[in-house]
Structures are given as C-alpha cells and as structure tokens.
C-alpha cells in the first residue's frame, strides 16, 4: 500500500507523527509514503497546476495500482468502512495507492481513474494534517482488521 502526496516541505511534527504510525504497522502492512513536488504557485491557473501535479502522480504510479483519492467532495467514510474496504482489497490482491492532492485539489482526470473517492469529513483540513489523519486511520483500520485493542469505539 502506498500514499502519494503532493508537497515536500512538511513541518517536523508531521513527519514525526506519520513515522510514529508507520513504525507501529507490521511489515506485511507497511505503507510507503511518496512525496511529489507541488507545482510552482506562479501566475498559472489552478487547473494548470493540478494538471502538472496529475502528470507527476501518473509517472509515480506502479503497474496495476488502484487509486483511492482523498477529496473534499468524496464519500464521507467511517473508520470501519475504511477497514472493511482495505480488508477486501487485501483479500482480492488489489494494490492500493491513496492520493492526497495539492492545495488546489486533485485534477479531474485523476479522480476519474480512482476506484474510490473518499472524504475525511466536511471540514477543511490543511494538507499536512491530512497526512497525519490518514496515517492514524490506516493504523486504526489495520488494528480493527487484526483484532488489535488500539481501536475502541
């Protein structure tokens, strides 16, 4: 499983939090985090920046990788839904890559290729915090599927 995320200069607290959840994961459920440089915020339009980031993400995709795009307009999901989806994908041998877009969002062509578009809620979260929330939710989903006591509803 991988997370492709736009942006490379994150505050130290983001890296520390993501690393903390990553080290808790067992090897067979390791998550690879791939940072993709954000498009330069010049006079270009948001659409052209998203297109450039989309092309960079496309170049980083692996064969047979299925995309799950995190998007404000995506389906609002529960942790249990995430856990069930991940268990199903693992059982079916689906290689999954989560995508966190840049400040302008995710290009429509990338959204169209996704097997799922999920929202972490209807609140607006800064991109660094989305990384931390996703890292924690991936760990929590694993804990549900593994019967680990971390998750208490």
Residue ranges: model-predicted function:
Residues 3, 68, 101, 134:
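Conserved RecA-like P-loop NTPase ATPase core
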Residues 15, 19-22, 51-54, 108:
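Short, surface-exposed alpha-helical segments at coil->helix boundaries
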